[in-house]
């Protein structure tokens, strides 16, 4: 929703809708508020038949850390990833990028094969300063049991605590934390397992579908959803 054309696209359909659900919260979500419909934040959805791995207990990985994504020709994003790569090389961390810096992307079955070979991954979206917004990497990584590193997205600790993902302040802080957890596998496993359990428990398809039905039909919320403060009816 932080892209104006996408916001306008959703608004164009809004007269025909009873409810709108978006993976963006805060001021951008509130721009969709209208008297005739409900607007609500929606977390990225995980499913146990899709996110099937338990990497926290996998001892046969050959990569310590991965990032899958593109640069989008954005200088700040490019610098972040280059600085991180330099720091990891200096720290002798076994890492791999996919989809950027002339490295081929991986998708579908090939993507899940990469996840199955990896201990840690980076949740890094195109924008990381938008309330509650993350790409679906967050459930792909945590839901498959990788130790997941994330920037401090506004409000995101309501979804995942510091016991469930590893938050970082910048690329240099991230590099230090990757090295730390590479050298402390028991602590890495503990957080990765907690993150996996949170995704399974809180962001599964059944629970989020239940939330959508309740909001759409203006029913009382049956649970204390972690994101229920972002419902505008």
Predicted feature descriptions by range:
Residues 2-159, 167, 219:
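Nucleotide-sugar donor-binding catalytic core of glycosyltransferases
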Residues 39, 92-95, 164, 186, ...:
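Secondary-structure boundary/capping signal
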Residues 103, 130, 163, 184, ...:
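Generic anion/oxyanion-binding catalytic loop in active/binding sites
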Residues 160-161, 178:
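Short acidic, glycine/proline-rich loop/turn micro-motifs
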Residues 165-171, 181-185:
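Conserved acidic donor-binding segment of nucleotide-sugar-dependent glycosyltransferases
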Residues 177-233:
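C-terminal amphipathic helix plus adjacent low-complexity
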């Amino acid at each position: 929703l932080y892209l104006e054309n996408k916001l306008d696209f959703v608004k164009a359909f809004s007269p025909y809708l009873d409810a709108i659900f978006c993976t963006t919260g805060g001021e951008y979500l509130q721009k969709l508020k209208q008297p005739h419909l409900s607007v609500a934040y929606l977390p990225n959805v995980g499913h146990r038949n899709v996110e099937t791995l338990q990497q926290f207990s996998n001892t046969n990985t050959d990569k310590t850390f991965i990032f899958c994504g593109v640069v989008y020709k954005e200088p700040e994003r490019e610098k972040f990833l280059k600085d991180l790569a330099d720091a990891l090389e200096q720290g002798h961390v076994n890492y791999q990028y996919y989809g950027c810096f002339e490295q081929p992307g991986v998708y579908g079955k090939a993507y899940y094969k990469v996840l199955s070979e990896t201990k840690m991954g980076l949740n890094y979206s195109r924008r990381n300063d938008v309330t509650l917004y993350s790409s679906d990497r967050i459930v792909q990584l945590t839901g498959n049991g990788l130790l997941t590193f994330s920037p401090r997205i506004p409000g995101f600790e309501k979804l995942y605590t510091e016991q469930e993902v590893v938050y970082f302040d910048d690329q240099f802080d991230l590099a230090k934390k990757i090295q730390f957890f590479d050298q402390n596998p028991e602590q890495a496993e503990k957080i990765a397992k907690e993150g996996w359990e949170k995704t399974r428990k809180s962001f599964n398809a059944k629970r989020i579908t239940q939330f959508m039905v309740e909001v759409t039909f203006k029913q009382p919320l049956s649970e204390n959803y972690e994101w229920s403060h972002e419902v505008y009816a």
